């Protein structure tokens, strides 16, 4: 049985970023995901303007950006529209396939171990360890 300082369940943007920072600090990290990367995501690729805070991880956002949103219409009470226009983007659309995969690659490059094709089922916490229980996706029919 392999031992890790940290096990991160889910290698999406949050999990991969957590694994990246933990591995960068010298922790032994297992990054587990039920999918195999690169993988498609059914959900949208919208990110808020705060992605710029991650420039130290991703140096070239143009590799992932589909579009920058600088205008939006919001409907308030009684369905009255409010047209919001900004000189700077306030929302970005990205390609999740490439973006998520690149974050996983960065985590692995820092030393995280990527374990693909299994899902965390449960975990048991004891005084000196946490036991992570999982099953292989080949034994089950997984879908996003």
State the predicted function of each range.
Residues 11-14, 18-19, 23, 107:
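Small-residue (primarily alanine) positions within well-ordered alpha-helices
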Residues 11, 37, 89-91:
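Flexible, glycine/proline-enriched loop segments at strand-loop-helix junctions
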